[in-house]
């Protein structure tokens, strides 16, 4: 077997192995995300403070109704799920995901949270996702068989307390 054929065979095997292991977490269209909780009072009112506590932010539907949305606020494709979970050794870290199910990929089919397990689930395809400890990875349903994970967003600490969520 020639050197080129051996390299080609190795490259093919490598691609097959790595493609089976990766989770596709970019199925949701790239829509702007910016939610400003940059002062401590706003974070104390609308943030998440204990493991499994969550909130949904959907600007077009005014959820939550009394949140101070501005012209500079953007809540992604299907809305933003903000949940407190584990990041490293910290079990009280704010984590953010798009609310749209990556299997359905429609902005009006939104995930819900199971209050017993703190897993996100899709009411249409019934896929379930680990949003507290595994970066929105699929754990059952069609999302697992297709390796579709949730679109994650960045949660950055703000200078004056609180956080800012961005894409």
Outline where the language-model segments fall:
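Surface-exposed intrinsically disordered loops and tails
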Residues: 64-69, 135-139, 143-144
């Amino acid at each position: 077997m020639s050197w080129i054929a051996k390299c080609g065979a190795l490259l093919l095997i490598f691609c097959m192995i790595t493609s089976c292991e990766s989770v596709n977490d970019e199925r949701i269209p790239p829509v702007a995300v910016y939610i400003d909780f940059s002062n401590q009072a706003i974070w104390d009112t609308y943030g998440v403070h204990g493991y499994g506590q969550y909130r949904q932010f959907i600007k077009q539907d005014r959820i939550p109704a009394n949140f101070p949305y501005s012209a500079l606020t953007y809540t992604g494709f299907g809305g933003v799920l903000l949940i407190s979970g584990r990041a490293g050794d910290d079990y009280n870290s704010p984590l953010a995901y798009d609310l749209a199910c990556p299997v359905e990929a429609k902005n009006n089919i939104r995930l819900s949270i199971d209050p017993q397990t703190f897993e996100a689930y899709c009411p249409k395809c019934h896929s379930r996702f680990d949003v507290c400890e595994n970066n929105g990875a699929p754990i059952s349903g069609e999302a697992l068989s297709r390796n579709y994970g949730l679109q994650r967003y960045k949660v950055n600490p703000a200078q004056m307390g609180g956080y800012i969520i961005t894409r």
